[in-house]
Amino acid sequence: MKALITGAGGQVGRALQSTAPPGVSLLALGSGQLDITSADAVTALVEAERPDLIFNTAAYTAVDKAESEEDRARLVNGDAVGFLSSAARQTGARLIHISTDFAFDGTASTPYPPDAPPAPLGAYGRSKVVGEVEAQNGALIARTAWAYGSHGHNFVRTMLRLMAQRDEVRVVTDQIGTPTWATSLAQALWRMADASARGIWHYTDSGVASWYDFAVAIQEEALALGLLDRAVPVIPITTADFPTPARRPAYSVLDKSATFALLGGAAPHWRVNLRKMLKDIQTHG
């Protein structure tokens, strides 16, 4: 089996490579190797390589910047998915596309099921919903949330840096979701692909947290592992205290019950996977 991975240098792209099952031939490409916004480039590569699976982890993820660059966000997160989907259909490949909790407006009080109507709050979310529509026709669309990994820019890395540099950190406490380790997501994606899952599915780690809860846990676990040498106050603030160009959903917990049933069990709790990720940093840097 051959699998094409776009966005190979990102958190999920790296995790897919490190968790690939035995016997899978990987073609992992970054933006410098494949411009997914070029329909001709996508078609030519897919026709030449003939992958069985196409994992699209490439994305425009600058949530705030997207408010002033919506055309660019839509091109990468929306139109380009259509190019990949078309190439997949033409060659018989299966597309596995990564989407987001930002598809929802956050007004719910219970986890969002996969068939909940999308209602994005901003440009980034709108662009990702366009991508979901473009990816239809047999694709697996996996919505996830609050992803982080050992590499790249993410909340865990940012908190570790700030906690080492500052006398206190301030973190919003009124946005609720579920932190998700990229390795956990990647392992699930391989299994879902093996099960020939299609349509929209939800996957995050188990449990619920605010960004404040997540930050507190990061400090506690990092101190226990010696990644931080001192504790600093973590101050809870509200979203109103920390205005940003893009609005964020206040509640974006996803209902994973169907996915967990497909996989034969629930994902580990987010704090368990946080500890695993920090141990990976401790070992490999």
Show where each model-derived region lies:
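NAD(P)H-binding glycine-rich loop region in Rossmannoid oxidoreductase-like domains
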Residues: 36-78, 87
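Catalytic helix-loop patch of NAD(P)-dependent Rossmann-fold dehydrogenases
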Residues: 68, 75, 80-83, 103-142, ...
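NAD(P)-dependent short-chain dehydrogenase/reductase
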Residues: 133, 137-184, 190
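Substrate-binding strand-loop-helix patch
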Residues: 150-151, 175-184, 204-221, 276
